[in-house]
């Protein structure tokens, strides 16, 4: 998404091959990190998100976001995943709706925000990977932009904190998995 209202990019160097890093990111249970669960609960409290909740099942990052309504725009195994949706994030019970990849660029339903997020791996050298997670959002009209920027003015702190907590956790798990696998292979 070349045109955007906000862009947040986070990256880590991980001592593991790209396929281990990407699989770890796909399978990582975002809410397994207590402070992330607290941030999500705090948003729900602040925004007055209510309704009945079914018991949460531990899902990987990609499975959970797809279950929430995100669609896949681009997927290159072990290299790149780009997911996108439209929503009105200023509501407590935000509903993400996937946009087909071939319609995403021209999607302009009023009073919506288009959001893309990506996971990307780049091999730096053998068993060393640059892992990037990026989020971009673009409001479809001026009224949506006004609402979104007001929401973003405070919500970004939690959203950014989630990424700051998530990437090191993915790094630790991928490096641990790679080290364990390497030790098993040499034994």
Please provide the spans of the model-predicted regions:
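Structured surface interface patches that mediate subunit assembly and partner/cofactor docking
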Residues: 3-4, 38, 44-48, 70, ...
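Glycine-rich, low-complexity intrinsically disordered segments
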Residues: 28, 32, 80-87, 97-99, ...
């Amino acid at each position: 998404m070349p045109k955007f209202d906000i862009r947040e990019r986070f990256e880590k160097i991980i001592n593991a091959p790209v396929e281990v890093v990407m699989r770890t990111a796909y399978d990582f249970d975002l809410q397994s990190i207590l402070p992330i669960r607290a941030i999500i609960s705090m948003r729900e409290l602040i925004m007055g998100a209510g309704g009945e909740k079914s018991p949460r099942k531990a899902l990987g990052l990609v499975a959970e976001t797809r279950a929430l309504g995100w669609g896949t725009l681009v997927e290159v195994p072990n290299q790149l995943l780009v997911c996108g949706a439209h929503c009105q994030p200023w509501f407590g019970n935000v509903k993400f709706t996937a946009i087909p990849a071939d319609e995403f660029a021209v999607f302009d339903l009023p009073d919506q925000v288009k959001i893309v997020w990506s996971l990307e791996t780049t091999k730096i050298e053998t068993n060393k990977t640059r892992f990037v997670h990026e989020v971009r959002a673009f409001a479809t009209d001026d009224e949506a932009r006004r609402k979104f920027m007001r929401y973003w003015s405070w919500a970004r702190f939690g959203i950014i904190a989630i990424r700051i907590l998530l990437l090191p956790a993915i790094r630790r798990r991928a490096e641990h998995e790679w080290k364990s696998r390497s030790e098993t292979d040499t034994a």
